[in-house]
Amino acid sequence: YEMQRSLVGSEMCIRDSTNTPDVEISDRLCEGTLTAIIKEAYRVKQQPDNYAARANIMWCGTVAHNGTCGVGREEDWASHALEHEISAIYDVAHGAGLAVIFPAWMAFMAEHNPAKIAQFAHRVFDIPKSEDLEEMALAGAARLKHFFRYMGLPVGFKELGIEHPDIDRMLVSLRRNKGELLGNYVKLTMTDCREIYRLAL
């Protein structure tokens, strides 16, 4: 169940991270759904039998996966590709792997294209607005990581039971499956992907 919460949350973050301009409605749909997931997840953590909270999370799952929030915007699925290599090599559940990779991906984006990540940080986690978008984005990534940890999710390779991840092996497979570049929000090279894996250690 916690893995599914991670997966749903990461699906919404993926749809939220776009360079497409003038998508305020779908921005708000993504961010509102993320806010609801977080609120209801905390309720379920405190009250595991809370039917209404669980029902709202299931509704969020439907919204996250039915494409509504991605209408009219270019999405970025690079974090999924990065995670697929973890699942393939180490037999890790997809949601667990995303809980590890996505905050690392966000931290990388904070340096290279912070605008949408900073917006996410402000609108979802109430990070104060600042002219330093990188700082805002890093704070948002840290808050998401804290949320995942509070929910009992792994947030690093060691917490997946992977003491020494074979990053070279993952990159060889990633290049074979996706080519030299992947993603849309920032086009990632294999060097960039190595850094994201490193940030997830």
Could you describe each region identified by the protein language model?
Residues 1-14:
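Single conserved hydrophobic/aromatic residue that forms the stacking wall/gate
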Residues 1-3, 72, 86, 181:
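Alpha-helical hydrophobic/aromatic positions enriched in membrane-embedded helices and signal peptides
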Residues 12, 97, 101, 162:
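Residue-level recognition of oxygen-bearing side chains
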Residues 18-143:
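Active-site segments that bind and position negatively charged phosphate/pyrophosphate groups
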Residues 117, 124, 128-201:
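C-terminal charged capping/lid subdomain of soluble metabolic enzymes
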